[in-house]
Amino acid sequence: MESTYSTEFIIWARKSQKVAHYYNYDLMKQLNGDKQMTDVWQLPAIGRWEKSCGKHPTQKPLGVLARLIQASTQPGAWILDPFNGSATTGIAANLLGRKYLGLEMEDEFLSMSKARREEIENSTVRNDYLERLAKAKIILPPDNFFVADETDINYGVPWL
């Protein structure tokens, strides 16, 4: 089977050296076979299962966002994505027990985002996503991390 490669550049910046940032070195090392994580990550491309609710022209692989969220936030943290698109960041945030607010101007992509959100509300689909990410060593096995209380999956924020 032939491999195809794509590259995503991620800029990790902050406004000032006075502002602290969070990086979970221990978890990243654990996910990387007990070796310090490098700044070049090789992750699976977008799978068909990630496009079950439609295609977005610049959709990112769920694994990329899951790794970024784990590396840079703690469980329960808020994640803001001002360019929501197909809500991959929101899906990753939700799967990893973070709160999420996404902004999107295009109705087509809002509908896709809502469908993806509804999809992971199904516990079978949610568990499948978590198992796929764990198998790819992007996250720890699902029983090893915090999962948000599903009684209010919207965190009190209305879903439009």
Spell out what each predicted region is.
Residues M1-M112, V157-W159:
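Core catalytic lobe of class I
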Residues E108-L160:
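PRPP-dependent phosphoribosyltransferase catalytic core
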